[in-house]
Design a protein with these regions (language model features):
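Adenine nucleotide-associated cytosolic modules
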Residues: 1, 6-217
């Protein structure tokens, strides 16, 4: 059955058919994101897609901190943050989303406050818990377009990998050790996954934590 458009949009609307009004950026958003909009590959349509995007960050530490701020500044509309830690003074040398004023606070709430102060367009969904096999399905069920993996341990990285493959969610994976850093994008079913490259974690002595081996701020 094909409905008639005779009578135009007014009749279509009056008859109760579905419709969607075109969305436009507000004047404030056009000003805030003007440097994005000037890029032909982005424009207003691309900026609207960023505002509609949902990104889940695993960790609000040395990797998650700058990632969260730049994603928020870019106008990614919804950021989920998973972290069970609290802000410690040893974090402040590199975890720039936190501050002296938030020492002792849960990292997810400290990050939420900073992100919302930076860009009120962004909604922050805090998960004050460590990602585990018991909660990963619940968290991913909230619907995420991309996962940013800034975890500081291998069990979590493998868990993120396995869940992302199952749910077909791309993962941006970051890691750092002292002066070295790595960034990799894993797109499930479009290329190899993290476990494909590293079937098992390295022995602990080859992968010390930041607390054990240090890290540049």
């Amino acid at each position: 059955h094909v409905s008639s458009m005779a009578g135009g949009f007014a009749d279509w609307k009056r008859n109760g058919y579905d419709f969607e009004l075109p969305r436009a950026l507000s004047p404030e958003q056009r000003s805030r994101y003007s440097r994005h909009i000037l890029i032909p590959e982005v424009g207003e349509e691309g900026q609207q897609r960023l505002l509609d995007a949902r990104v889940l960050l695993i960790g609000a530490g040395g990797l998650g901190s700058p990632a969260s701020l730049y994603l928020a500044a870019a106008g990614v509309g919804t950021l989920g943050i998973v972290d069970a830690d609290i802000v410690d003074d040893s974090n402040l040398q590199r975890q720039i989303v936190h501050s002296t004023n938030t020492l002792g606070e849960p990292k997810v709430l400290s990050a939420k406050r900073a992100i919302e102060a930076l860009n009120p367009d962004v909604t922050v969904v805090p998960y004050e818990e460590r990602l585990t096999s018991e909660n990963v399905e619940r968290i991913l069920a909230d619907g995420w377009d991309v996962i940013v993996d800034g975890a500081d341990n291998f069990p979590t990285r493998y868990l993120v990998n396995d869940a992302s493959v199952w749910h077909h969610i791309p993962v941006v994976h970051g890691s750092i050790y002292r002066f070295e850093g790595q960034v990799t994008v894993f797109h499930p079913h479009a290329g190899p996954c993290y476990r494909c490259l590293y079937p098992s974690p390295p022995p602990p002595e080859l992968a010390p934590s930041c607390a054990e081996g240090g890290v540049l701020g």
